[in-house]
Regions:
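Hydrophobic h-region of N-terminal signal peptides that target proteins for export
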Residues: 10-18
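Extracellular, modular beta-sheet/disulfide-rich ectodomains of secreted and cell-surface proteins
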Residues: 812-895
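Beta-strand-rich ligand-recognition modules
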Residues: 809-813, 826-844, 858, 862, ...
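Short acidic/polar inter-strand loop motif in beta-rich domains
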Residues: 202-204, 735-737, 936-942
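Bacterial N-terminal signal peptides that target proteins for export
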Residues: 1-6
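Acidic/aromatic-lined carbohydrate-recognition and catalytic surfaces
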Residues: 69-187, 196-222
Length: 946
């Protein structure tokens, strides 16, 4: 019996393991495979338990694997009402097997503790007071009597009397700590300057006008964790690491530039603190100034990152949870002193993963340079680079996505945004939002459920399934990336510096992937030179790009030289570094290294500047390298792209991500972001790929074969993509006899019409009440049909697809009439009647009306938040729609190329974008079958079998 029982257990385990293959999870999407997709779920403190549970049920039905419980704001945040509502959320998460994240602020920005940060724990700024002393003069003072005293330093002025000589600095701080100081300048005939350093409370934040916690002082961070984090653990600790996944921070700022941990950072780095303090607030003479100021900026960022974000993450780690979130990244705020201490990467390296926010219309289908907040296009690469170069678990990187885009956000747009994130390596998507108050709210829609008044809710499941399947294959395993781009946000604080957005885009257009690699990560021992590769965690970079920067650290450029001499490929563009950002090293030291790499007289050009003895090559390209120029240089150096196009037109909108998955197989994600409807036929070439290419269809959950050829150590394959259709290609060990992938040339064995079902109960979407503040632009339409399927068409090996055509535009251009349009600040600060403005746009043929902040003035990010509300009549039906600043109102929307399908009452999948088909094989039964297609009108509904 014992032997039989043991054997039986082994057999059951084997069956379970077979059932839990990557392919099985991809097809079936169990809840655990969905945990990288999950929305913000808002809590205000005025919702009933019944309301919260009802909307959480919709979160689960929508195919999510997680949600973030966010105070928006909760009227009792950190009070009993807050914990009561979190308890309701936690019970629902357990019931639905969802992971739950906890928002760490009453609204945003994080680390303001609902505006209740005590002065003693608030962020600090360094203040300097200088006293000029003539030769032989004496300083008398007692600066340490001030509780905010930091340091007392003296230094000799240069001959011009404008700057302090770095090697003359004298530390008078120990004297000051003992009491009154009386100090006479040396008898050298030179003027001296005595500098008193102290701190003051940092200004209130730009968002919210609140004080924030000092992230550079351990006692302040300890108070913050004690006040915000520990009470949650005290109540819900048993769920930590199980149902509760961790905490989410939102848009913290870095108003402070000094804290009690700063000097420890200087000491750990072996950097003298005195010249750095002086350079930060005053001026050092000669080359020491940029180097010392840079070192202060780096130490500041490191201190804030280690103390605040490292402190939070370590607290979370000890309780088996994670710390995630995002800063403000758009418009280069990721290198802004007040938003991320000058370099977001140095702060967020201490979090559990990289993260960004993508909101308003920062991303627009078919556009890279948007009017709002540019540049934004490469912020996803910023997030994934943090995860890649700092070795975050499974290369997870997150994005809070779609916030304030407006209720007229379409599902094809959502897919397009998701493809952009995923191809850049961002694989945890947090949609914004499920709001229990909706539709009686205007707070940054879209609301995907909208209180039951959003007919497109069924499409959310289609989108969630799609992006969850992408994340399943594109997280874990190893990232395959040929290029590293050296990066330092703080180098921009002390001289000319070009951030890497344009270069990254050019590389992606040439089908080369890259990671942004901070100077300090490149310099440290974790990044190793192995022949012609840079090895970092799982990364194997074959080429290194040096940024167009006026200054660079000596250690970074010295390692660039070592990489070149070991056989690596080095690319500069625009300008080569001239200044040293390392104290004690000079421009002459930088010049010697630069000349070793690029030669003494490097000029921008196409050919290599130098070739090393071990095959290393250096290039110096134009200020804005084209994809063609980058591809030529890298190709000449023997660095292959992620993917080559042998035939077919990308239009500059086809990009690729390559990984090795958890089972050791190569995976390509080919993101086709062309927005027209034209199908494109490609022949691709995958360098160094091994195995049989299979297309894993993330939209339909099926695996198919494509024509392919083995070419030496590479693989070529043919792939046709519809407009906006992207593809996962996985290289299997052997030919598994997969069915052929369908194209427009494929012909079905049989086509069965699906007839309207006259006996079906009509489905009518509820109409939003008159007091609704956010109204869907879609009225909704449901097709209910019936189809009879002969048994022989369901034979083994046959595939059956539900196929349909979309009906197109709603309404007639002549039936739309604007009744009233109002633009008003939601805090009552002002309003304007803009009926005439909107009416004129509509008469001119426009169907999209932007919410314009210029009408009332002010910046939508920091001023009064305003809402545009339009009441209109279309084809005899009245409706009201609204959108906040930066979003758009769509009147008379077109039917989206999207559908959700049910067969015999069971959810069967759906599609977003072409091709308009769903694999329904396993849902069909011989004989009569019912079919439901929503939420847009369809025609020519049919079942095609292959």
């Amino acid at each position: 019996m014992i032997r039989f029982g043991f054997a039986g257990c082994v057999m059951m385990m084997a069956v379970a393991l077979r059932a839990d293959t990557l392919e099985n999870r991809f097809r079936e999407l169990p809840r655990a495979a969905r945990c990288n997709t999950g929305p913000l779920f808002w809590l205000h403190g005025d919702e009933t338990p019944e309301r919260l549970n009802a909307v959480l049920d919709k979160v689960a039905e929508g195919g999510n694997g997680a949600f973030t419980a966010e105070s928006r704001p909760h009227k009792e945040w950190l009070g009993e009402g807050w914990y009561r509502d979190l308890g309701i959320c936690l019970d629902a998460a357990k019931r639905h097997d969802l992971k739950m994240w906890i928002f760490d602020e009453d609204w945003w920005p994080s680390q303001t503790v609902a505006g209740k940060v005590p002065q003693q724990y608030a962020a600090k700024r360094l203040k300097g007071q200088a006293l000029l002393l003539k030769p032989g003069a004496r300083y008398d003072g007692n600066p340490a009597k001030d509780a905010a005293f930091v340091a007392l330093v003296a230094g000799r002025l240069d001959k011009e009397g404008q700057a302090v000589v770095a090697d003359s600095l004298v530390d008078l701080t120990p004297l000051a700590r003992k009491g009154p100081v009386s100090w006479r300048t040396p008898a050298d005939g030179e003027a001296w300057q005595v500098m008193v350093f102290s701190w003051v409370t940092a200004p209130r934040l730009k968002q919210g006008n609140r004080l924030s916690v000092d992230g550079m002082s351990r006692d302040c961070v300890a108070w913050f964790i004690r006040t915000v984090y520990e009470p949650h653990y005290a109540r819900f600790g048993q769920a930590f690491g199980k149902t509760i996944a961790g905490y989410f921070y939102d848009e913290p700022e870095t108003a402070g530039d000094w804290g009690t941990e700063l000097d420890a950072t200087f000491k750990a780095r072996g950097v003298a603190w005195m010249p750095c303090y002086v350079a930060w607030l005053f001026t050092l003479a000669g080359e020491a100034q940029p180097a010392a100021k840079y070192q202060y900026a780096e130490a500041r960022a490191e201190t804030w990152g280690r103390t605040m974000f490292g402190g939070i993450t370590e607290w979370c780690r000890r309780r088996d949870v994670l710390s995630i979130g995002h800063f403000m990244e758009h418009n280069r705020l990721y290198v802004h002193n007040d938003y991320c201490a000058g370099d977001m990467m140095l702060l967020q390296k201490y979090s559990s993963m990289g993260g960004i926010d993508a909101v308003f219309d920062q991303f627009v289908m078919g556009q890279r340079d948007t009017r709002r907040d540019a540049p934004c296009w490469q912020t996803p690469k910023l997030a994934s680079s943090i995860s890649h170069v700092y070795g975050k678990a499974d290369d997870l990187a997150m994005c809070e996505i779609f916030g304030a885009r407006g209720q007229d956000l379409t599902y094809p747009e959502m897919k397009w945004w998701a493809d952009r994130m995923q191809v850049c390596g961002v694989n945890v998507l947090i949609p914004h939002s499920f709001n229990p108050r909706a539709p009686h709210d205007t707070d940054c829609p879209p609301y995907f459920y909208n209180g039951g008044f959003e007919p497109r809710l069924a499409l959310y499941r289609v989108w969630a399934d799609y992006t969850s399947r992408l994340s399943l294959l594109l997280a874990g395993g190893r990232h395959v990336c040929p290029v590293a781009v050296l990066f330092s946000g703080n180098a921009r604080q002390v001289g000319a510096y070009t951030t890497p957005e344009d270069l990254t885009s050019a590389l992606q257009d040439a089908l080369y992937d890259c990671d942004w690699l901070p100077f300090e990560r490149f310099e440290d021992g974790v990044t190793k030179i192995k022949g012609n590769e840079l090895r970092l965690h799982g990364e194997r970079y074959r080429a290194l790009v040096v940024p167009p920067a006026e200054g660079i650290t000596f250690a970074a450029l010295e390692k660039v030289r070592a990489f070149f001499e070991a056989g690596g490929t080095v690319i500069g563009y625009g300008r080569l570094p001239e200044r040293s950002l390392t104290l004690g090293k000079t421009a002459a030291d930088i010049a010697r290294l630069r000349e070793t790499i690029w030669g003494a007289d490097a000029r921008p050009g196409k050919s290599a500047c130098r070739t090393g003895r071990r095959g290393g090559r250096s290039y110096f390209l134009a200020e804005q390298p084209t994809p063609e120029a980058l591809a030529a240089a890298l190709g000449e150096a023997g660095v292959p792209p992620v993917l080559r196009v042998l035939s077919g037109e990308t239009g500059g909108w086809v990009h690729a991500l390559r990984r090795v998955d958890r089972e050791g197989r190569d995976v390509l994600f080919i993101a086709n972001q062309n927005t027209n409807d034209a199908a494109r036929a490609f022949t691709f070439h995958a360098p160094d790929a091994a195995g049989v290419p299979e297309v894993w269809d993330a939209m339909r959950g099926e695996v198919t074969a494509v024509p392919w050829r083995k070419e030496a150590d590479d693989v070529s394959f043919d792939l046709t993509l519809e407009g906006g259709e992207s593809a996962l290609v996985r290289f299997a060990k052997r030919d598994a006899g997969r069915p052929a992938r369908l194209t427009s040339a494929s012909r079905p064995v049989a086509t069965l019409p699906v007839f309207p079902d006259a006996s079906a109960d009509p489905v009518v979407y509820p109409v939003a009440p008159d007091n609704a503040l956010t109204v869907s632009p879609v009225t909704g339409s449901v097709f209910q049909g019936v189809v009879t399927v002969p048994p022989e068409l369901l034979a083994d090996g046959r595939r059956a697809y539900l196929v349909c055509d979309l009906e197109g535009r709603h309404g007639s251009p002549d039936t739309l009439r604007i009744l009233k349009a109002t633009y008003a600040a939601i805090d009552g600060a002002g309003s304007a009647d803009v009926t005439r403005f909107v009416s004129e746009r509509v008469r001119g043929g426009a169907r999209v009306v932007p919410a314009l902040p210029s009408i009332l003035g002010g910046d939508p990010a920091y001023g009064h938040v305003k809402t545009l509300t339009v009441e209109y009549e279309d084809d005899g039906k009245r409706a009201t729609v609204s959108a906040r600043d930066g979003a758009r109102i769509t009147l008379r929307p077109q039917a989206e190329t999207a559908a959700a399908v049910r067969v015999n009452g069971a959810y069967a999948g759906g599609f977003i974008g072409n091709p308009c088909r769903v694999n329904i094989t396993r849902h069909l039964q011989p004989g009569s079958n019912t079919v439901r297609v929503e939420p847009f009108g369809v025609q020519n509904v049919r079942v095609e079998t292959y």
